[in-house]
Every structure is written in structure tokens, then in C-alpha cells.
Amino acid sequence: MQNFFLSPAFGRNSQGPGHKAMGQLIQHAIPAARKAGVRIVWVNWGLTEDQVESMPTSMLRTFGAVGAEDTGKDGSVYVGLGGETGMRDDGKGGEVEGGGLLMRGAWNSGLYGELEKVYEEGRKLESNPDVWVHKNRMSALWGGRTELEEFLEEEGIRSLLFTGVNTDQCVGGTLQDAFSKGYDCILLGNGAGTSSPAFAQNCMEYNAQKSWGFVADCEGFAKGVEQMT
């Protein structure tokens, strides 16, 4: 849930599905996970120059300015992976250098709004601190080996709860790969949002429930934790 995908500085609707999902996470899911000792892994785009150089054409097109209008995208926002995003409104009355699109350490790749504070609090926990994992595709579990897969194996984690944006792209891609690799998958439906039409969200929730694992919601997860503790 990075600035590029949620910040009004990139034309995002501050009342959209992604922001509603963020509210559910902050209010219900994250506190419940911490109470239950569930490890929170913040999986985010964080590209290196080498990764941009080796990126397949299909991925370059997804975030590129060339042909953006044909897919309903703003060419001034979708400047190409690694492309400079320029000065942006920081949401605090000032401006900030947006940095290279989805590059590691860039402002546009940082967590949006209150989530940054939530992450900083979580990574300082003495037990099961939050973890930040970089990815370089929509799915964080694509191919033979990724940073996320290595972490999950090292920690012996086999059951995964999925949240974030966009449900039908990054979240869904990772969930499907996780399912194929033998993980138990639970989609927290209202903890995930997408800028795609509503049917895209419905499709992901339908298949997550019928084929890829389970679907729950953030409030239900929190209530379940409360009953267990």
C-alpha cells in the first residue's frame, strides 16, 4: 500500500477502495495480528537499476507512458519503471521529490499515510517484529525463488493472510502463486481493495473462497483473535 498506489499526489481517490481497506487494516486486522503474535510482512515494490534493466516488456508496458492513454492511464503518472516522478504534494502542505517509479528508497515507493507510522511501530517490537520485503513483479512469489519465499521458509510460515492493493493484481498474483506452492491462503476481503471495476474484486473473492483457500474479513479476524486470547 505504497504512495504510488494510494496518494492523491498520483491522482488516487482518497475515498477509494484501497483507502477503505487501509482503514480496516489499521482499525481491526493489524492490532489483531499483533495481539495474536501473527507476523506482519510488508511486501512492496522496491526495484534496483539491474532489475529495471532486465524487466520484461509486458511489465514495462504496464507502468509505462507509451500507450498509457489506450488503457485509461495518466501518462504523467505512469512514467515507466524507474522513471522520475518529479515533485509531488506530500499531503502535509509541502512538496517532496517523488523519485524513480517504484525504486527502492523513493518516496513514491514508501508506505502511504498512517501506514508508515504503523510499520515503524511494528518493526520495533521485541517479539515477531514487522518485516519489509521487496518485490520486483506483481507477484512476490513468482518464479523459482524470491525474497518473500526465502523469508517464509526460514521462519517456517505456511499459512498466509492476504491484504493490500490491488486485489486483482499484486495481491491476487501473490495469492495464486502461494496457493500453487502449497501455502494455506486466506484473503481478508475488506482488507484488500482495487481501482479496477467491482467485478474484479468479486472475482478474486469468489475464487479465493472456492478454489485457492479461504475468505474472511478484518472484523471477523479480530473477533476470532479476541475469542482465542
Map each language-model feature to its residues:
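Short catalytic/ligand-binding loop motif for oxyanion handling, primarily in non-cytosolic enzymes
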Residues: E49-E53
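Short, flexible, mixed-charge acidic loops at enzyme active sites
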Residues: M55-L60
